[in-house]
Every structure is written in structure tokens, then in C-alpha cells.
A protein has these predicted regions:
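Sec/Tat signal peptide C-region and signal peptidase I cleavage site
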Residues: 18-24
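Extended serine/threonine-enriched, polar tracts that run as long, contiguous segments within proteins
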Residues: 321-322, 326-338, 342-352, 361
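Short, surface-exposed coil-to-beta transition loops
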Residues: 202-205, 216-217, 339-344, 356, ...
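Bacterial N-terminal signal peptides that target proteins for export
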Residues: 1-10
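Non-transmembrane domains of secretory- and envelope-associated proteins
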Residues: 25-119, 227, 237-317, 324-326, ...
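Solvent-exposed N-terminal domain segments of exported/luminal and surface proteins
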Residues: 25-218, 224
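Hydrophobic helical h-region of N-terminal Sec-dependent signal peptides
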Residues: 11-16
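Short, hydrophobic/aromatic-rich segments at coil-to-beta transitions
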Residues: 186-192, 218, 323-331, 354-358
Length: 433
């Protein structure tokens, strides 16, 4: 029987993964690639968050760093995205009290924004952190709808101690490439998830809804097959550990909540080594449906799965690379007294609006946790549609010396025309019939 604590943490998950990190066997590394290890850790000084660099120095992590064509990397997003972003200059402003987005000409919250609302950031602007956060949030949604089956793996020094398998479907409204035909509940985004394994989790279904306003909390419902009913859940559980693992629902994309939930400020700018698959766009393969496409993802093998691994059991040993990217160093902090995190430091790409790393402090101000958030990019054959997708979170609790991997799916699908009824309370209950 599921405990209530287990149930709440699973609900939070839906508001949603020899060794060195190399490409799969048979895939040569690009010219200029190099290995970062304990033997040359100094090369990454000021290019990794301090807790991560310490683990490289200790021999826990070995990474493959590859050179990057910055312009080609930007072309992971479509030309239309960049043009729309430029056209947005001067169109939007922020509500000073809530950090909510509003159209400058009407003062109203928009229901749809294509491209970055703030294509130029002045770090001296007191609202710059909030503007960076909005660029990040809306870039998350350009893929419109998506789904994948994945695992959550709890890992300590002895290897894997827990594994959960589930699928997650997500539909976006506010920042998608093409505006949705219908949005009957005035949502920014919605997700549905279904737990598949282990047996004590099977049939647990989660529905989340993010309303398009400045002040409301997310709507969360969990359906437990033993109870045969859906139950409302507090959105602050996004900061609770998922099923006792060292990973949190707010780790999706390195931040999964509304922009308005945090107070944001830029505290620096630098270059960072960013975790990606690729680093250039993967292919979106056609299916029988004109609105659905599939993307094959190289598997991110963990150290605990790799014979001869000498680093941390949770390090990624295959198909993950690091690329050097310019980032804003942004501090975020929730004002919700029920939210467990205190100050959170995030490293956000200045161009691509991706959060690659975050360092988390508790409400007493003590650092305890780092999340590494990896992404891949995919495009249609004619380059007219592209998106970015999270493919893994490596969450590491530096107080307990444990970690969790979330994601690491082998395939994903992109759905450009989800039926809204698939994300309803009725659908939530029927999943386990």
C-alpha cells in the first residue's frame, strides 16, 4: 500500500534519468574534443559550479568536452523563432509586484507569446532576472506537446537502490510555435503522468494544470487505484523529494514552476560547460499521424551500468557531452512558506534560455544539492519546426552523498495537436480502468 508521503512526492513528479562520458561505440568524437578529469580539473575552473568541480577534482566525474559552432548551435532553434524574438522587442513589460508578464499596449497578461519576450537583457535592469526567467519559461514550450516513457533511478555508492518507471505527456499553450486552436481552461501548460513500475506505484496517475494568471498556484490531482478517486495536492510539493529519491519535481528543466513563484535577480555572468546530447539537432521522424513525430535519443548510460567505472556510480559515461556556453547566473527564491528550497542559483544560457545547472540551498541558507539538466534539440526535415527537450536530470545531494537520475528515455514523441480532453479529471481516472 502506498504511504501518503510516497503519494505526495509522486504527485510532485508530474509537474513534470571505463569510464568517461563518451559517445556510443562506433560514433567518433568531433575534432578538438577533450576529456576533463581529475588529472586536468584546473581547465574547468570558473566553467563549472563549485560543487561539480570539486567532484571532478576528486575523481567522481569525467566529462567529454566538445568544441561548438555557436551559430550552428543557435540554429537548433528555427529562423522564425529568432525573427519573432527580435520583433518582440518593446512589446512586453512586467508587473512589478508579481513578475507577471503583460503586453505593453494593453497592460494585460497575454495568452500567447512566440519567441523571447525580452530579446535584449541589460544586467543593470532591476527586472533583468525576471525577464531572463520569462525567456526561459516560454522557450520550454516551443515544442507544443510531447511525451516519453522514462525512469527515475536512486543511486548511492553501492549502485542503484530504487527504480521507478513512468510516462509523462505534456501540452503547452503560452509559448508554443503555433497558437493552439482551443484552450478552454485558460492554461499555460498541463501534464498527465502514469506510473508503470514498481508494483506499489503502478496505476498512480497525476494531472497538473498551470493557469494563465499571475497569482494562482498550479492545480494538481493524484489518482490512486486503491482509493479509486482523485485527490487535490498542494503545488508546494514540487520541492519535496520524489519517492524518497534525491530528485525533485522542480528539477524538470531545472525549474518547473511559474515564473511568478520566485523572486529573480541576476547575480553574475560567465561561461559554463553545459550538458547536452548532440550538440546539434536530432531528426524528427514522421509517423502515421501528421501531427506526431518521433525522436530517437542516444541512451545516457550511468556509471553503475558501466563495467569498470571508477567514478561516482551516478556519473554519465556515454552520449553526454559538455559545450561551453555564455550564461546569466541568476538567483531565485520562493516566497511560499511551504516550499522547502531557499536560495537557488541557476546558470541560464544567454541565447538558448536553457538552465544547465542549479545549486540549491535550504531555507536556513545552507547549500545541499546540485542538479545537472541535460537537453537535446530536434528539427523537422525542412527546418520549419524545432524544439528543445530535457532528457535527463542528475540530482546530487552533497550532504548525503547520494544521487538520482531522472529521464534517460530512448525515444520521445512530439505532438502538435493534443486533444485537451486527454488532460482532464475524467482522463485521469480512466487511465487505470
Amino acid at each position: 500500500m502506498l504511504s501518503s508521503r510516497w503519494f505526495v512526492s509522486m504527485a510532485a513528479a508530474a509537474v513534470l534519468a571505463l569510464p568517461s562520458s563518451v559517445l556510443a561505440e562506433g560514433q567518433p568524437l568531433p575534432e578538438g574534443a577533450w576529456t576533463l578529469s581529475k588529472d586536468n580539473w584546473q581547465k574547468a575552473e570558473n566553467l563549472l559550479p563549485d560543487p561539480v568541480l570539486k567532484r571532478v577534482k576528486a575523481g567522481d566525474y569525467t566529462f567529454t568536452v566538445v568544441p561548438l559552432d555557436d551559430q550552428k548551435f543557435k540554429e537548433n532553434y528555427t529562423a522564425d523563432y529568432w525573427a519573432a524574438s527580435e520583433a518582440n522587442e518593446g512589446k512586453y513589460e512586467l508587473d512589478a509586484e508579481t513578475c507577471g508578464l503583460k503586453a505593453k499596449d494593453t497592460g494585460e497578461l497575454p495568452d500567447y507569446v512566440w519567441g523571447m519576450p525580452f530579446p535584449r537583457i541589460d544586467p543593470k535592469d532591476p527586472q533583468a532576472g525576471c525577464k531572463v526567467a520569462w525567456n526561459f519559461y516560454l522557450a520550454n514550450q516551443m515544442g507544443e506537446g510531447a511525451g516519453a516513457t522514462f525512469t527515475l533511478n536512486g543511486i548511492d555508492r553501492n549502485g542503484e537502490f530504487r527504480r521507478i518507471k513512468m510516462w509523462l505527456h505534456a501540452n503547452s499553450y503560452m509559448g508554443r510555435t503555433k497558437k493552439s486552436k482551443e484552450n478552454p481552461e485558460n492554461l499555460r501548460a498541463t501534464t498527465m503522468s502514469h506510473a508503470m513500475e514498481p508494483a506499489d506505484a503502478e496505476g498512480v496517475n497525476i494531472l497538473s494544470q498551470q493557469l494563465n494568471d499571475w497569482t494562482s498556484q498550479d492545480n494538481l490531482w493524484a489518482y490512486l487505484p486503491q482509493m479509486r478517486r482523485a485527490r487535490r495536492v498542494n503545488a508546494a510539493t514540487r520541492s519535496d523529494p520524489i519517492a524518497g529519491l534525491d530528485i525533485f519535481a522542480d528539477d524538470l528543466n531545472c525549474y518547473a514552476g511559474k515564473v511568478e513563484y520566485y523572486k529573480w535577480k541576476i547575480v553574475g555572468e560567465q561561461n559554463i560547460l553545459a550538458p547536452v546530447i548532440g550538440p546539434y539537432s536530432l531528426k524528427q521522424a514522421s509517423t502515421d499521424s501528421p501531427t506526431r513525430f518521433e525522436v530517437t535519443i542516444p541512451y545516457l548510460r550511468g556509471g553503475y551500468e558501466t563495467p569498470g567505472n571508477k567514478g561516482a556510480p551516478w556519473q554519465i559515461t556515454e552520449n553526454l557531452v559538455l559545450v561551453e556556453r555564455p550564461v546569466w547566473k541568476v538567483e531565485g527564491e520562493s516566497t511560499d512558506p511551504y516550499y522547502n528550497f531557499g536560495k537557488v542559483i541557476m546558470y541560464i544560457d544567454k541565447d538558448m534560455s536553457r538552465i544547465y545547472w542549479k545549486n540549491v540551498h535550504n531555507r536556513a541558507g545552507e547549500y545541499f544539492y546540485t542538479a545537472m539538466c541535460s537537453y537535446h534539440f530536434s528539427k523537422s526535415d525542412d527546418d520549419s519546426f524545432g524544439t528543445t527537450t530535457p532528457n535527463m536530470v542528475m540530482g546530487v545531494n552533497d550532504k548525503t552523498d547520494r544521487a538520482a537520475l531522472g529521464g534517460r528515455y530512448a525515444t520521445q514523441f512530439i505532438e502538435r495537436d493534443f486533444d485537451p480532453s486527454q488532460f482532464s479529471l475524467r482522463a485521469l481516472s480512466r487511465l487505470s480502468d
